[in-house]
C-alpha cells in the first residue's frame, strides 16, 4: 500500500471514517513511521479520534484533537497545533475530517499549504449500507458537497461497507458493484478495502490491499469516563 505524506479521510456520518483514520495511523506506526493524527471533526461529538488516545499513545502516534474534546463543552475548537500536520514534513500526517459539508469547512484553512506541498491523498470513506449514501449517485453528491465546503478534491475511495458486528465476507463482496459504479462516477481509484480481521482473512485476493481494522471504542462505550464527561443521553 503506497503512502502519501498527508492522508485525509472524509465521508458521511456513520461511514466509519474515524475508525479508518485511527487504524491507518496505527498501520503506519507499525511500519516504523513517525505519525501524527488530527481530529478536525468539530461537528459530531459522538465518534471521536480522542476516544482512541490510549491506544494511539501506546503505538507512539501523536494525537491532536479539538480543544475540550471528551468534555461537556458543546462546541470544541481546533488547536493551533493542528497546523503541524501541514508544516512538519518529517511526519506522516492523518486528518479525520468532519462528516458532511459543515464538518469539512474546518479543513479549508489548511488547503493552501496542502496544495503547495502536493503530497496528499484525500480519501472518501464509502459504506453502501448507510442511509443517504445507499446509491453511488447519492455518494457522489455527498463527495461534491464536502469538496465544495473544504476546497479540496477527493483523490481516492476506500470501501468500508459494513453492517457492524453482523458483517461477513459476503457483506463486503456484495458491495463490489456499488464501489465499482462509485469509482466510475467519481473517476477515482479504489485505494483499499477495510474490514475487521475475521472478515479480512476470508476475502479473496481481488480485494487487496486490505486495511485490517480494530474497532475503535466510542465515547459512550468507554468503561470509565473522565470527570466532567457526560453520557450520550445526557
For the regions a language model picked out, list residue spans one by one:
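Long hydrophobic alpha-helical segments typical of transmembrane helices together
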Residues: 185-234
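Switch II (G3) loop of P-loop NTPases
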Residues: 66-71, 90-106
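Walker A (P-loop) phosphate-binding loop of P-loop NTPases
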Residues: 14
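Hydrophobic anchor at the beta1->P-loop junction of P-loop NTPases
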Residues: 9
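N-terminal phosphate/diphosphate-binding loop that engages ATP/GTP or pyrophosphate donors
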Residues: 27-74, 78-81
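Conserved lysine of the Walker
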Residues: 17
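Hydrophobic positions on the alpha1 helix immediately C-terminal to the Walker A/P-loop
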Residues: 20, 24
